[in-house]
Amino acid sequence: MDKGEQFLERNPKRDKVQMVPQHISDKKGLVAVDVTWGEIQTIQAADGIRTVGEREVIKQLQNGLPVIDVRAPGTRNGIRIAGTKAIPISDIVDRIDELNRSKPTIFFCNGPQCPQSQKAIHMLLKAGYPAEKMWYYRGGMHDWMTLGLPVVEDNE
């Protein structure tokens, strides 16, 4: 193993992975995180795409601006960030007209190890969506939940 490979070695993937952190029912404020799934992602989704954190997501939601959850239905685990709109990655290009090209839109998925939002951004770029109007929340559900920020039941 060369020096570069030793930093990429990860825990073996479990048979049934849990992509969204789980609240530990009897321990308020504690979540369990499964580190055995996913891919290592870059900090920037693509050239011209701004990467944002939780404060920007909160401000976007407070201002009534769009925050899009691109997670496939089977990867949502029944929860989402309140105020977000679900447009699964499989539908993102078909539903491009639901996006407001005049306002910055934040896209997110399950977190730093989840490729869904980066892939969705690349699909939208290829479809002609303006890079300067797409922001990438790399932390996704993983960071949102591990910071103790509120989530709601996902009925979409």
Task: Place the predicted regions along the sequence by residue.
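Short, structured coil segments at secondary-structure junctions
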Residues: 80-82, 130, 147
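Structured helix-beta-strand junction loops
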Residues: 63-64, 102, 147
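Mid-length scaffold segments of soluble, non-membrane domains
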Residues: 66, 71-88, 97-99
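General small-molecule cofactor/ligand-binding pocket signal
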Residues: 85-87, 135-137, 152
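Catalytic cysteine-centered active loop of the rhodanese-like fold, especially the PTP/DSP P-loop
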Residues: 93-144
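Alpha-helical scaffolding within the catalytic cores
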Residues: 53, 89-96
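Flexible, polar/low-complexity N-terminal or interdomain linker segments that lie immediately upstream
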Residues: 1-75
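Active-site neighborhoods of enzymes that stabilize oxyanions during catalysis
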Residues: 148-156
